[in-house]
Swiss-Prot record:
Cu cation A binds at residues 209, 213, 239. This is Phenoloxidase subunit 1. Its EC number is 1.14.18.1. The active site is at 351 (proton acceptor). Binds 2 copper ions per subunit. It is found in: Secreted. PANTHER family: LARVAL STORAGE PROTEIN/PHENOLOXIDASE (PTHR11511), PHENOLOXIDASE 2-RELATED (PTHR11511:SF4). Activated by immulectin and lipopolysaccharide. Disulfide bonds join 580-622, 582-629. Keywords: Copper, Disulfide bond, Melanin biosynthesis, Metal-binding, Monooxygenase, Oxidoreductase, Secreted.
Length: 685
């Protein structure tokens, strides 16, 4: 059974090559029944089986099963793009996930996969199989290959692949030099938005967004796959933190905070030209010109027919629910939005997912915003164009408009949050615990250093129909020197205590260099870490390494570095180890800063663990990046609201962060200093 489970990973190898061809560096071949071959290969089944099987080092016989009805998922053409935001695509994917989840054992799943891989759109097949592997009890422990490894065309300049194919065909494996990905290739310096392209187009950040939506799908016949603990609240908080981080990056680069796109009839000021090619669709991703507008959609091929005015209706109904602090249910009654579960319900309404309390009334606001933005260039399909990057969770964060749309979404959530009663002293203080200081230890005290770093990602598994062997792409990304937090705490109770340490960071001044009120600064507070800590009586010195952040996952997990896997690199068996790919990339933990040193404030709070804890066993679970991703098959590991204590405003609009501080909190003025130098991975401090 273990072999059969591992064999599933071969379906991710070279996704456009038929599964009867050799897979993996160890030349594995699936021996499929004759009637599994598509019509174009049926007459050649024996020839193909012998051709690829003779050189195989391992043959995997495929069980002949009664095949399920694949009529619905096969409605998406093999060479089209696939979007979770398009309702028709969502329905097709939900059906395929249901089929994969319904297979009685791994052997049957392997069998239906071999049939589907030859017929189903590769993007949809990859997504649905990934969701099934994550959620089936008999496939847990499998590490799904990173999407950037399987479909690298979604993450980097299309010119890279011409060079990569040349290298693959001309140079033998083992002698190939990495192919360089330029750091700036979508615009030049006359475009102000290009100053933050390093953030928007970062491979790790886009992988995070893709993987988050993989862990939290919003449609499935199996409701339990979608209905995870505090899923709607996590949708709110993860995206709120993205907008907070993006705004801080903009401020570091002399740009104003991102403007919400709240007037759906207004022109979109920002254009975007992605410079990506789809290897499945054999098309260039369409651009969006500056000044584009949302237009009524009438795309029969996608079964999308919707008026822009519908967005206004859904928005107004959503705002009405917040004003009333109650949502309208399908039966006509009203369900109150309380301070504990209200944000979770609103998150499910906004996204929206199948667990939306009333999708018929509140609609599909967030998703359809993505769809309208993705089709500004061809709203009625007259030019036979497919959607732009806003239509794909793996590419959407590249587009400046993603942040304008999600700033609007976050502003709506914030209206609800501002209606909640400000936290009282009792909700904030931890009697007997006094934080006397917090600081950062690094090369220089309370100074964070950032720089450029070059790393590599494997392309070989995604280069279909080319000679085998490793082909690396070298790309440049932001990085920071590692550091540690030093927190001095005094426990005056005379007994042992447990606390939850919460660490945030925000700019010290606004876009104009002026001090910020608490209510403005709190929305720029980015979470850096959260962990439980024993506090013995008297003075405690807490040291916490930045690499242990509860927000991030390391480079090796973001990019599935083959050298870090157990076993022989390149084999399916090497991929099985306890792994979770959802988490903010660690190299983007700290904003870029400036050459002069960008002023930020570091905040630490220690709350009472007895008020925060969730009783559950976390042994063997993936829990090292829980802040933005939760924990697989467990409850969110913090009873407090996500973003606490900055998710609510203070009653006094003029109050500052210093007015907010309690004895169990401390702040420190710090600086982020950027050095415009580039180092190879492993060379930074």
């Amino acid at each position: 059974m273990t072999d059969a489970k591992n064999n599933l990973l071969y379906f991710f190898d070279r996704p456009n090559e038929p599964c009867f061809m050799q897979k993996g560096e160890d030349k594995v071949v699936f021996e499929i029944p004759d009637h599994y071959y598509p019509d174009k290969y049926k007459s050649l089944s024996n020839t193909l089986s012998n051709r690829f099987g003779n050189e195989a080092t391992k043959r995997i016989p495929i069980r002949n099963i009664t095949l399920p009805n694949l009529e619905v998922p096969m409605q998406l053409p093999y060479n089209d793009q696939f979007s979770l935001f398009v309702p028709k695509h969502r329905t097709m994917a939900a059906k395929l996930i249901d089929i994969f989840m319904g297979m009685r054992d791994v052997e049957d799943l392997q069998s239906v996969c071999s049939y589907c891989q030859l017929r189903i759109n590769p993007y949809m097949f990859n997504y649905c199989l990934s969701v099934a592997i994550l959620h089936r009890p008999d496939t847990k422990g499998l590490s799904i290959p990173t999407f950037a490894e399987t479909f690298p065309d979604k993450f980097m300049d299309s010119k890279v692949f011409l060079r990569a194919r040349e290298v693959s065909n001309v140079v033998i494996s083992g002698s190939r030099m990495p192919v360089n990905v330029p750091i700036n290739y979508t615009a030049n310096t006359t475009e102000p938005e290009q100053r933050v392209a390093y953030f928007r187009e970062d491979i790790g950040i886009n992988l995070h967004h893709w993987h988050w939506h993989l862990v939290y799908p919003f449609d499935s016949a199996d409701r339990s796959i979608v209905n995870k603990d505090r899923r709607g609240e996590l949708f709110y908080y993860m995206h709120q933190q993205i907008i907070g981080r993006y705004n801080v990056e903009r401020m570091c680069n002399g740009l104003p905070q991102v403007k919400p796109f709240s007037d759906f009839s207004a022109p979109i000021e920002e254009g975007y030209f992605p410079k990506l090619d789809s290897q499945v669709a054999s098309r260039t991703w369409p651009p969006r010109f500056a000044g584009s507008v949302f237009r009524n959609l009438d795309r029969t091929v996608d079964q999308v027919k919707i008026d822009v005015r519908k967005l206004f209706t859904w928005r107004d109904q959503f705002l009405e629910a917040i004003q009333k602090m109650a949502i309208k249910m399908p039966n006509g009654r009203e369900l109150p939005l309380d301070e504990v579960t209200g944000i979770d319900m609103l998150g499910n309404l906004m996204e929206s997912s199948i667990i939306s309390p009333n999708r018929g009334y509140y609609g599909d606001l967030h998703n359809m915003g993505h769809v309208f933005a993705a089709y500004t260039h061809d709203p009625d399909h007259r030019h036979l164009e497919q959607f732009g990057v806003m239509g794909d969770s793996a590419t959407a964060m590249r587009d400046p408009f993603f942040y304008r749309w999600h700033r609007f979404v976050d502003d709506v959530f914030n209206i609800y949050k501002e209606k909640l009663t400000p936290y009282t002293n009792e909700r904030l203080d931890f009697p007997g615990v006094r934080v006397s200081s917090v600081g950062i230890e690094g090369a220089r005290p309370n100074t964070l250093r950032t720089l450029w770093q070059q790393s590599t990602v494997e392309l070989g598994r995604g280069l279909d129909f080319t000679p085998r062997g490793s082909v690396l792409a070298r790309f440049t990304h932001l990085q920071h020197d590692e550091f540690q937090y030093v927190i001095e705490v005094n426990n005056t109770t005379g007994g042992n205590l447990m606390g939850t340490v919460r660490i945030f960071m925000a700019p010290k001044v606004d876009d104009n260099g002026q001090p910020m009120s608490f209510n403005k600064q709190r929305r720029l507070m980015i979470e850096l870490d959260k962990f439980s800590q024993a506090l013995r009586p008297g003075t405690n010195t807490i040291r916490r390494r930045s690499v242990d952040s509860s927000v991030t996952i390391p480079y090796e997990r973001t990019f599935r570095n083959q050298s870090e896997r157990p076993g022989d690199p390149g084999t399916a068996g090497a991929a099985e180890f306890d792994f979770c790919g959802c988490g903010w990339p660690h190299h983007m933990l700290i904003p870029k800063g400036t050459a002069q040193g960008y002023p930020v404030v570091l905040f630490v709070m220690i709350s009472n663990w007895n008020n925060d804890r969730i009783e559950q066993d976390l042994v063997g679970s993936c829990n090292d990046a829980a802040s933005y991703c939760g924990i697989r098959d467990r409850k969110y590991p913090d009873k407090q609201a996500m973003g606490y204590p900055f998710d609510r405003k203070m009653a006094n609009d003029a109050a500052t962060l210093s007015d907010f501080l309690r004895p169990n909190m401390a702040v420190r003025d710090c600086s982020i200093q950027f050095s415009d130098t580039t180092v190879e991975r492993g060379q930074q401090g």
